[in-house]
Amino acid sequence: MGSRGCSCWLLSLALLCSLAAAKEQYHEFVIRETTVKRLCKSQSIMTVNGQFPGPTLEIKEGDSLIINLINRGRYNVTLHWHGVRQMRTGWSDGPEYVTQCPVRPGQSYRYRFTVAAQEGTLWWHAHSSWLRATVYGALLIRPRDGTSYPFHVQPTRELAPILLGEWWDMNPVDVVRAATRTGAAPNISDALTVNAQPGDLYSCSSHDTAFFPVTSGETNLLRFINAALNTELFVSLAGHNMTVVAADASYTKPYTTSLLLLAPGQTTDVLVTFDQPPGRYYLAARAYASAQGVPFDNTTTTAIFDYGAANNASSAAIAMPTLPAYNDTTAATAFTTNLRGLRKAELPSRVDESLFFTVGVGLFNCTNATAQQCGGPNGTRFAASINNVSFVLPSSTSILQAHHHGAPGGVFTADFPASPPVQFDYTAQNVSRALWQPVPGTKVYKLKYGSAVQVVLQGTNIFAGENHPIHLHGYDFYILAEGLGNFDAGADTAKFNMEDPPMRNTVGVPVNGWAVIRFVADNPGVWLMHCHLDVHITWGLAMAFLVDDGVGELQSLEAPPPDLPLC
């Protein structure tokens, strides 16, 4: 056999072995009400399989998942597999009325997808109303058999995933419905949580504080997920440094720090060497609150890391870390700007679509509404927008279904603006009231398959400037740069990191600042881009990209599954 024939045979054998190694997992996720006790009172919440947080899914790169969602709850629901690329499988992405109609009580739907070319920590959550306050869990993707993590130090073991969340003393769905009805801001959460437990600093909570046994001298892998609805979080472990090795299931150059920042939706993997005197150490998390004058949950959640020493009496003092001030933007910026991709970026040499998106909060005037519907400042209703378009979900069918059937009429329009309709000093202290009111609409921006897309995300100071965690479904993207103030194409383009920018699926657009992302539109379908502060997506801070099919089956959206829910 010639060398060329041998090479082809070996390549085919390698491909077959790769396919053989991949597995398919089947899980049933039953949505149902479960009674739990937090902050001294019992409450009925929505859960998956009665678990809070929900089940952890553990797979290897290349594996496929079939999740049979059975809705035995009282609300419509969908599930989103946050950060999963969903190549050609947009029907399984999950945001209600964007890629599917919701699964109604008594109905079911099977999500089917393969997790390819992704390793690390992702997660899943409800994508209907505010159900994700209690319907969420981890998705852990390990390297295939025969490969290892590309870390400078291999961990002795992995600890259980650390899911950070928020807790309300009332039904979160009632919280958002009341706010939608009145036009006012929703109630803030009553507690922050680690693995659904508030921790020692809250009433009636110390007995169930999240607990992590560790062994002196070991280096462990810790996986953090910010599943909170509306709160960005500073996180620190007393007495220990953490070396960041991945973010949003993309590997990073090792970065050692005592402080993490996670926006809602983001994940961070770290290595920690437990080399301190035997004892107990608090992991603590509290808010990074970047908006001036806006109420926020100012409590602190804790978990305990325990060396298990024989002389470690339970009454001994537990070391507490020092966390930054709530509004410490300098600390937040220092963390995000120190992240670098592990390898040289595969950036496109050209940009086909250069977009400029303003993101921010605004207000609707209340000319034809009652006083009870106008609970915002000065008799208004809160709103939010991208490029002055406040996103409205359809109700008769999903955007993806309407697109697939060639019937967008009455569902969406393909005229989302590539730039804001009015240019102004986006981060000025006194933005004109004439710019405060967005226009409601269900608009998408069309992209050709394979086009290279660059988006400048510009924060605005309309009403109140704030750090906005912007999440893009169906894609990872490179973060080329971020900065404060208004983006200046002439000066700021020179700051782009074209060598090793971090790759993520959720980027924090700095308060009164900007971030620039770039990706290739190689995944056909309809893909939501939105602020992952749920209060803001509720107000309309979202848009969607419609990516056309390419050439042939492998560049085209799969056919809709037969059990796709009806509206």
UniProtKB/Swiss-Prot annotation:
Binding site for Cu cation 2: 82, 125, 532
Record's keyword annotation contains Glycoprotein: yes
Binding locations of Cu cation 4: 468, 531, 536
PROSITE patterns: MULTICOPPER_OXIDASE1, MULTICOPPER_OXIDASE2
Cofactor note text: Binds 4 Cu cations per monomer.
GO molecular function: copper ion binding; hydroquinone:oxygen oxidoreductase activity; oxidoreductase activity
Keywords from the UniProt entry: Apoplast, Copper, Glycoprotein, Lignin degradation, Metal-binding, Oxidoreductase, Repeat, Secreted, Signal
Annotated Plastocyanin-like domain residues: 30-146, 158-310, 415-551
Function: Lignin degradation and detoxification of lignin-derived products.
Record-given protein name: Laccase-23
Record organism: Oryza sativa subsp. japonica (Rice)
Gene this protein is translated from: LAC23
